């Protein structure tokens, strides 16, 4: 399922979206390549090769989450991002850490289902076309009549004609499930029962729609008929175990310092619950059991108050690769504004173009934006590249508000305009603390 890249290619791909942080990119690139290397092995040694989990250390807004997210997208692997602070020790009210793996399985099933849908799309389209023809001419029409209508259908001559179609009734698919007390991971509820009875009874509903709009629901309906649900689940469980990536953010918030009590005990409990998950255990899900031995865990934290050594020694040992991400400089912020494929500058220019407004942001304006962001990060709170979004919104506030009334016009944003928009706020510490 995963796409294979060399470490150099992975870093090159990440460079398209993330500025700097070479060490972090190299570490995740090697970790991803090692998964492919492991899968080329055979026999006992393949089971013995464990993923080298990663701990990213660095201030907020420097690219920790983005690196992990882009990596998973690049690999086509199941990926889940969680915050360590959202979980509680087993026995306390709240989410337990095994929910991470259950969420990962759900994501894997969605990935596999989409892949399988693409594989049967052509066949589903043919079947959907036959059903549209049946709705137009009936089941008893002669082959000549069907062929005549098929030509008209493909030419788009019948797009606006209204027909009635019969599709599966999926209205109960979003019904809730419930955990069975005393059996973590085992679930039973309305959804499971409706699945059982839905398949036996083949519940359908009649929809009145145009020929053009009928194709999508019919293709979806036909795709579902062609999919083997058991095969999807088995493949999803396999890629979860071998290709899954779990990103645990804010792990520094559950690190306990000496002398802590009360809440610190619960935080230590979360760490202890994470230990078997990271080391390798079996988690029960409603689709089957998942071995976590070969799931890659990437943890990250700013470690402003605590330090990595405040984590439980056992957990530190299970995060062997340490990567420190650097705080962003003015040059980094300037590059973030302009270089990535979907940089902030390109995003705002594209947004204004939808209103037929031509937006030009000069080089000196970009320098000034980076200057202001660096200054605010230094004086108030260092939130990294996220500060650029705050400053950009403030600068373009007036242009965004009046854009619908000024179609066909051009706006030029230079250094003077930037200073006029945020200069006074940026220089007033009390105001900038609240507004920027």
UniProtKB/Swiss-Prot annotation:
InterPro entries tied to this protein: AAA+_ATPase, ATP-dep_Clp_protease_ClpX, ATPase_AAA_core, Clp_ATPase_C, HslU, P-loop_NTPase
A cellular component term, taken from the record's GO annotations: HslUV protease complex
Keywords noted in UniProt: ATP-binding, Chaperone, Cytoplasm, Nucleotide-binding, Stress response
Record: residues binding ATP: 19, 61-66, 249, 314, 386
Keyword Lipid metabolism: no
Gene Ontology annotations of biological process type: protein unfolding; proteolysis involved in protein catabolic process
GO MF entry, a single one: peptidase activity
Cysteines engaged in disulfide bonds, as pairs: none
SMART domains per the UniProt record, alphabetical: AAA, ClpB_D2-small
Subcellular location: Cytoplasm
Pfam families: AAA, AAA_2, ClpB_D2-small
Principal localisation: cytoplasm
Function text: ATPase subunit of a proteasome-like degradation complex; this subunit has chaperone activity. The binding of ATP and its subsequent hydrolysis by HslU are essential for unfolding of protein substrates subsequently hydrolyzed by HslV. HslU recognizes the N-terminal part of its protein substrates and unfolds these before they are guided to HslV for hydrolysis.
Subunit structure: A double ring-shaped homohexamer of HslV is capped on each side by a ring-shaped HslU homohexamer. The assembly of the HslU/HslV complex is dependent on binding of ATP.
Membership in a protein family: Belongs to the ClpX chaperone family. HslU subfamily.
Protein's UniProt name: ATP-dependent protease ATPase subunit HslU
Organism of derivation: Bartonella bacilliformis (strain ATCC 35685 / KC583 / Herrer 020/F12,63)
Lineage: Bacteria, Pseudomonadati, Pseudomonadota, Alphaproteobacteria, Hyphomicrobiales
């Amino acid at each position: 399922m995963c796409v294979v890249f060399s470490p150099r290619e992975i870093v090159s791909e990440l460079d398209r979206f993330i500025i700097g942080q070479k060490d972090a990119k190299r570490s995740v690139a090697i970790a991803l390549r090692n998964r492919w290397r492991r899968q080329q092995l055979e026999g006992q040694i393949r089971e013995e090769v464990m993923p080298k989990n990663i701990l990213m250390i660095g201030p907020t807004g420097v690219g920790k989450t983005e690196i992990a997210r882009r990596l998973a997208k690049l690999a086509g692997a199941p990926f889940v991002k969680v915050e360590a602070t959202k979980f509680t020790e087993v026995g306390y009210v709240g989410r337990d850490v095994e929910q991470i793996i259950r969420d990962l399985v759900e994501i894997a099933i969605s990935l596999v289902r989409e892949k399988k849908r693409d594989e049967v799309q052509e066949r589903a389209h043919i079947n959907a076309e036959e059903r549209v023809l049946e709705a137009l001419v009936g089941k008893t029409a002669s082959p000549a009549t069907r062929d005549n209508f098929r030509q008209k259908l493909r030419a788009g001559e019948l797009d606006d004609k209204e027909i009635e179609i019969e599709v599966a009734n999926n209205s109960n698919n979003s019904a809730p499930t419930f955990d069975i007390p005393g059996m973590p991971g085992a679930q039973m509820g309305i959804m499971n029962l409706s699945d059982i009875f839905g398949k036996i009874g083949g519940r359908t509903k009649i929809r009145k729609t145009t020929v053009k709009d009928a194709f999508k629901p019919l293709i979806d309906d036909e795709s579902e008929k062609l999919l083997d649900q058991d095969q999807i689940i088995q493949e999803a469980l396999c890629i979860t175990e071998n290709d899954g990536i779990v990103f645990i953010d804010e792990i520094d918030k559950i690190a306990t310092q000496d002398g802590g009590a009360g809440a610190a005990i619960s935080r230590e409990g979360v760490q202890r619950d994470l230990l078997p998950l990271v080391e390798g255990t079996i988690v029960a899900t409603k689709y089957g059991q998942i071995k976590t031995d070969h799931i890659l865990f990437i943890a990250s934290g700013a470690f402003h108050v605590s330090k990595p050594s405040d984590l439980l020694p056992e957990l530190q040992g299970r995060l062997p690769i340490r990567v420190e991400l650097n705080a962003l400089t003015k040059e980094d912020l300037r590059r973030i504004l302009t270089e990535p494929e979907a940089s902030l500058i390109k995003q705002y220019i594209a947004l204004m173009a939808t209103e037929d407004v031509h937006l030009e942001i000069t080089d000196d304006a970009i320098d000034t934006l980076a200057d202001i962001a660096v200054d605010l990060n230094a004086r108030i709170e260092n939130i990294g590249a996220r500060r650029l979004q705050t400053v950009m919104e403030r600068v373009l506030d007036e242009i965004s508000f009046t854009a619908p009334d000024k179609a066909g016009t051009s706006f030029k944003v230079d250094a003077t305009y930037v200073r006029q928009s945020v200069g006074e706020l940026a220089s007033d510490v009390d105001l900038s603390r609240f507004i920027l």
